[in-house]
Amino acid sequence: MADEKGVTSEYEREPVPEHAWLGLKSYVGQFAGEHVAGTELMIGPLFLAAGVSAFDFFAGLFVGNLLAVLSWTLFTAPIATRVRLTLYYHLEKICGRRLVVLYNIVNGVMFTVQAGAMITVSATVLGVFFKFRMPELSDTLPTGFGWVVAVLATGVLFSVVAAKGYRVVAAFANLVAPLMVVMFVVFGVIGFRKMGVTGLDNFWEIASTRIWTGGEPQPGQVKFTFWHVMFFSWFCNMVWHIGMADLSLFRFARKSWYALSSAAGMYLGHFMAWIAASTLYAVQLQADPTNTAVLPGPLAYNACGALGLLVVVIAGWTTANPTLYRAGLAFQALVPEASRAKVTLITGLAASVTAIFPVVIMKLMGFVAMWGMILMPMGAVIFADYWLLPRFGMRRFIAEHVRLPMNWAAGTAWLASVVFSVGLLMAFGADKIFFVSFPSWFVAVLVYVALSRSLQRSYPPDINA
């Protein structure tokens, strides 16, 4: 999962000039590095806890990640390389300042919760040393004083670094990215060996009968099929591709097809890393079927000892810090007079409090799906505004042209899409959260185009000139 788009923040309110455009190599390295993150150590085991079969797992991952790559390539990058604006400035020109402020609030809250999940990942390392009780899959509340202290200590440390030393953390993250990829390969090799895989001749037999067996899910988990895996793999980064957050990233790309570089992150990162992480959980269950806890610290320690623990710390550290930084920036936009460091520190403390409650990390897949469901509609608005409005004789960037503080057509489309998603969940069950964003995208597009017609009719005839 992507957490920090490390591209420079220059040209925040103007198109990126040609001399600042970047080549393909920049994007291959960035995607490969940022998608082998702390979240992978949680998500991989959760597939296994969901009782997925080997075929559904591998086929779903392959197709879902392919759809994610195509979404970046066909939806995000073509607009990004034509307009070359940040997401926030692009939205401001369409929606008006007030709606962008609301978007920032929601985005900041989501980033804060995700940072809390990464703090939880790293805190599990302390549990290996101090032997306090750590959360299980079914836990929703703190499991004891030791857990609370470990999480708060980790969170405070991460918050201080995010507030004071982001440049150092970003440089460190880029430095260790190759190590992270290598270590996930090592995790996978060790996991498969311990499960009895000796070569390609018995790989599928072991994978389908001893690892991804397709049995009943762990208590409290949703049973996963091919469709669950496919849609989750596709939509776990929905905010970035269909949700258009990566307009800010690809505005620097020389060509729109550079978005194919996202395959490095999807297949080297998500595909490989999720498989590797889930094998570690299989090893744990083989040793003790009653030990269903999904805890990255113990999982990595059992595989690689102290080096495994170091990987967990680095993965959580390099993921949580840029996530806290982004959350701080989102909230600082609401109070420009406050220092970024102070806002980031407060945000980090809030993330630490959320991290105490294991329900966040144990339901990480559902949280990621909900995040996409809430923010995806604004990506649909951007898509419709750029490609569809001119085809129907309407003007793009209406808020900029008539100085609207809030584009009610965009706001209504956002609300209608979310309400439609919630309605589907109420009708068909909360376990369908991995699917509802697909039809809801079309709802957002249709509502925005229809209401934009009414909105633009209320302005002078030359508005569409």
PLM feature spans:
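Transmembrane alpha-helical segments of multi-pass small-molecule transport proteins
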Residues: 132-164, 178-187, 227-246, 271, ...
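Membrane-water interface regions at transmembrane-helix termini and the short interhelical loops
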Residues: 49-51, 77-78, 94, 102, ...
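C-terminal membrane-solvent junction of multi-pass transporters and transport-like membrane proteins
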Residues: 379-465
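Membrane-interface loop-to-helix entry segments
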Residues: 149, 153-205, 260-266, 367-380, ...
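Juxtamembrane transmembrane-helix boundary signature
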Residues: 62-95, 104-119, 284, 447, ...
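Membrane-interface "cap" regions at the ends of multi-pass membrane proteins
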Residues: 1-56, 212-214, 218-231, 250-258, ...
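Hydrophobic transmembrane alpha-helices that form the core helical bundles
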Residues: 100-138, 316-333
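Hydrophobic alpha-helical segments and their helix-loop junctions in multi-pass secondary transporters
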Residues: 123-124, 179-216, 231, 238, ...
